[in-house]
């Protein structure tokens, strides 16, 4: 449970807020690379409450600049991407990827006025099929986010994104929560073709949670007791401030688990503003064979991010305005929720709480350890940054981490058994 004041601190990310200052110290996803082919029309981007446009110029450089022209504040979303810059269609002012004004055709040729005009622009980098942006102090740019999934060949990973209509922390906490999976995502029968989980998830609906603090965030394990003196252990990773890793390596029953290749999956919960998030979903395989087209289609259906499931601006077709198209008959006979898509099920729950949930009214239990740890870490980080310090997770210690799941004999030290696979550095109990 947080106080109302603490809740405000961790949820608000606009300019001048403590958590906004934290976010600006990291590289943040701004777009998927395929959204910006060369010389494409500009696209709208909203990050931390700022309205921006992104475009790729003739040389392949990506610009992320203020949406509004410096002249009369017309939207550059309506602009023309031409010959190395973005031109406003109102009076023809043209800007390069760094926000410099290149041309003012409505001003006398001899004037130097254009050299005095510059739009706000943020550095960008293309890594792993994602366009990343850095919005913080120029003297504190961190290393690029080279997670393992960003370094594999393109056909070994699957990327998507979708809007979540609630605060970023709400979205993140929905993913960090492990205990919900055996309820929210449960398939009621193996015969259903709808997204759902069975198998080990059903053995224990009250997993034991352990949190291990790292220098990038924390690793947490969820342990479920199985018959024959065994435990099903899932090790997750939380990388500050909005990354979550989860494993998919054991062939469970249930339609949501039909992808047989071992994978690590995850989400990035990026604040658009205080009441909306853009969730980037990634999956990569470390098998010998790449993901096939059928694998990618299955992942899209599983997540709820298939083309037919999203609008042009990445809003879910199944959304709060239509009650996520819940099917009460399916809820009775096939899946626990009656909502299609594992990630859509997550979104529905978090969005149902309202734009920013009042955490002062919660009653947390033993399976909420990871959520409590994340909140403590965020509050401490906000204090650290406010005092001039550096936040965790801006170095390279997380580059090779993985999330894993294993069946281990009873009595085995999970952290010790999984250490070589998850690569947690400098861990200690939370």
What are these regions (language model features)?
Residues 18, 76, 161:
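Short, flexible, glycine/charge-rich loop motifs used to bind or transfer phosphoryl groups or to couple energy/partner
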Residues 3-17, 50-52, 85-86, 92-96, ...:
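A broad, low-specificity signal for short, low-complexity segments enriched in glycine/proline
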Residues 24, 118, 125-127, 263, ...:
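A short, structural micro-pattern
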Residues 1-51:
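Zn-dependent metallo-beta-lactamase
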Residues 15, 61, 138-430:
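C-terminal catalytic domain of Rieske-type non-heme iron oxygenases
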Residues 31-158, 206-208, 215, 219, ...:
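Rieske [2Fe-2S] iron-sulfur-binding domain
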Residues 27-31, 53, 63, 130-132, ...:
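Ordered hydrophobic segments in well-structured contexts
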Residues 1-4, 18-21, 101, 105-113, ...:
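Short, charge-rich amphipathic segments
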């Amino acid at each position: 449970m947080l106080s109302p004041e603490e809740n405000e601190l961790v949820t608000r990310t606009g300019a001048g807020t403590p958590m906004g200052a934290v976010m600006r110290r990291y590289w943040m996803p701004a777009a998927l690379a395929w959204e910006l082919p060369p010389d494409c029309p500009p696209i709208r981007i909203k990050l931390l409450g700022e309205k921006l446009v992104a475009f790729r110029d003739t040389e392949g450089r990506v610009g992320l600049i203020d949406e509004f022209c410096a002249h009369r504040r017309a939207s550059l979303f309506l602009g023309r991407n031409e010959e190395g810059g973005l031109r406003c269609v109102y009076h023809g002012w043209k800007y390069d990827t760094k926000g410099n004004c290149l041309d003012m055709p409505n001003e006398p040729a001899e004037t130097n006025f254009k050299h005095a005009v510059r739009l706000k622009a943020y550095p960008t980098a293309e890594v792993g099929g994602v366009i990343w942006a850095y919005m913080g102090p120029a003297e504190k740019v961190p290393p690029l986010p080279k997670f393992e999934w960003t370094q594999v060949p393109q056909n070994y990973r699957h990327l998507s994104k979708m809007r979540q209509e609630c605060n970023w922390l709400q979205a993140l906490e929905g993913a960090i929560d492990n205990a919900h999976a055996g309820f929210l995502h449960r398939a009621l029968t193996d015969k259903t073709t709808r997204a759902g989980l069975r198998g080990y998830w059903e053995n224990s609906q009250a997993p034991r949670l352990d949190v291990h603090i790292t220098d990038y965030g924390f690793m947490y394990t969820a342990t479920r007791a199985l018959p024959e003196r065994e435990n099903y252990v899932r090790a997750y990773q939380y990388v500050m401030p909005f990354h979550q890793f989860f494993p998919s390596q054991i062939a469970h029953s249930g339609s949501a688990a039909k992808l047989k290749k071992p994978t690590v999956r995850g989400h990035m919960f990026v604040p658009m503003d205080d009441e909306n998030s853009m969730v980037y979903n990634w999956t990569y395989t470390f098998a010998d064979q790449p993901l096939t087209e059928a694998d990618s289609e299955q992942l899209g259906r599983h997540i709820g991010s298939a083309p037919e499931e999203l609008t042009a601006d990445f809003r879910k077709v199944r959304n709060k305005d239509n009650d996520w198209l819940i099917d009460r008959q399916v809820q009775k006979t096939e899946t626990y929720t009656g909502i299609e898509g594992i990630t859509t099920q997550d979104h529905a729950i978090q969005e149902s709480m309202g734009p920013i949930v009042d955490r002062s009214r919660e009653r947390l239990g033993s399976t909420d350890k990871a959520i409590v740890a994340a909140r403590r870490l965020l509050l401490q980080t906000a204090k650290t940054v406010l005092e001039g310090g550096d936040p965790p997770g801006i170095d390279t210690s997380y580059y090779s981490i993985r999330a894993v799941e294993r069946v281990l004999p009873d009595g085995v030290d999970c952290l010790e058994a999984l250490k070589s696979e998850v690569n947690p550095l400098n861990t200690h109990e939370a």
